Amino acid sequence: MALIEVNASPERDCGYDKVAEKIYRYPEVSNMYLISGRSEFIVIVKGRTMREVADFVGQKLAPIEGVKGTATYFVLKQYKVEGVIIDQQEDDQERLLVT
């Protein structure tokens, strides 16, 4: 999973809605938010691998008309999701078994 900051240009009469629609229609996008700050959007993208997410950003997201730039942040570890604290000890044990 990755959080992607998207810089975009607004369009006359519709603002950011059209570029947002071009982005949120992709099945890889699980959540999308218009935000205040240095970027216009935060997009949550789910993929099986970092490469899959990177390919989505490079081949589908970045070329969209109206998208000026992106910054991708890969989630390395989760501590709390949807109000639920992730059991770190259990997570660490699973990692040990896999390696």
Regions found by a protein language model. Give the residues of each.
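A compositional/biophysical signature of low hydrophobicity enriched in polar/charged and small residues
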Residues: 1-99
